[in-house]
Amino acid sequence: MTYEEIADIFPVEFALRDADKLRYRYPNGESYMDVVQRIKPVLETIKEEDNLLIISHQATLRCLLTMILGYPSEDLPYMKVPLHTVIKLTFLNDEVTVEYHRLPVECVDTHRVKPTNCDISRQLEDACVTVPFHL
């Protein structure tokens, strides 16, 4: 489903997620905070490895990067993690360097900034103001 279809068919769920994307759980789903709790043990393993390749969903990568880079958890759902990209982390002393290497794959931009109007009674066009352009 597109963002527009979700906003149209499930306007209350769409608004509730917009209001608290960090903690919101879709029915039978996980919140970002649930994912953070699930991957914390994995993060401890990652810190002990020399080289590691992780292939994952954007949401999981947002959680990992937020924890590794020490970003505030409130920023987690809005971190830009581009599709079809190799993200290289280099650990040196107490610093982490991040490099993004985009692969030549055409795709839509799925990054959505935090909306300002999260009211459950908002109009469809207001709900979709921050929806990224797609074909």
Where is each model-derived feature located?
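Acidic, low-complexity terminal tails and accessory targeting/binding regions
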Residues: 1-8, 33, 48-50, 66-135
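A general structural motif at alpha-helix termini
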Residues: 10, 18-21, 39, 80
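Generic structural signal for well-ordered alpha-helical scaffold segments
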Residues: 36, 40-47
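Generic beta-sheet signal
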Residues: 45, 49-58
